[in-house]
A protein has these predicted regions:
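Short, structured segments at the rim of ligand-binding sites
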Residues: 1-183
Length: 183
């Protein structure tokens, strides 16, 4: 609502989970012609000035891809294509490809999109992930590691209890049901 306010809006914060979403929002607002500035931990939006209407293309959702990466990781053979996903992305969840690669998920970009393929797992020991900037990947990544009995250490999950349900508690309950030790 910032640009709709008579004096615009200025916001500051000490820390922000998922900073990439703030950066993506600012970039999209700029592309639409809004006067918005992000500097450090503050954002300033000037009052809206009417401009020529613009149409922009929205990126595909990278967090939704995590569950398809899980399907590939848990399969013995798979090849899936996702039109429209490109390597350049403002979304923090773009890291999903890096996180699932050691679990046997290969990827190739084409001009039309993204190809996922089953590869040999590259894991030798415990995986360590920091999901502070992409917490929406936690469910798919953690349940994949559960299913593969892959030791892992994951941190940066402080926002999970504040989603539509307590995602962290749900994952702990699932681990308990599967006989997996969670610390």
């Amino acid at each position: 609502i910032g640009p709709a306010l008579p004096n615009g809006l200025a916001l500051s914060w000490e820390s922000v989970p998922s900073r990439s979403y703030v950066e993506m929002t600012v970039a999209m607002m700029k592309e639409l012609g809004f006067d918005i500035t992000l500097e450090g931990n503050s954002v300033t939006m000037a009052p809206y000035t009417a401009t020529t209407p613009r149409t922009i293309a929205l990126e595909r959702d990278w967090s939704a891809l995590a569950f398809w990466c899980e399907v590939v990781a848990l399969s013995t053979s798979a090849s899936l294509f996702f039109p429209g996903l490109q390597p350049e992305s403002l979304q923090g969840d773009r890291k999903v490809l890096d996180y699932f690669e050691p679990l046997g998920v290969g990827h190739t970009f084409t001009s039309d999109g993204l190809q996922l393929t089953k590869k040999r797992s590259l894991v030798y020991g415990k995986l360590v992930y920091n999901l502070e900037q992409c917490p929406d990947l936690a469910q798919a990544l953690i349940t994949t590691c559960f299913a593969l009995r892959q030791p892992m250490e994951i941190f940066g999950l402080s926002t999970l209890p504040h989603k539509e349900c307590d995602r962290l508690q749900a994952l702990v309950e699932l681990a308990t049901e599967l006989g997996i030790t969670v610390q």
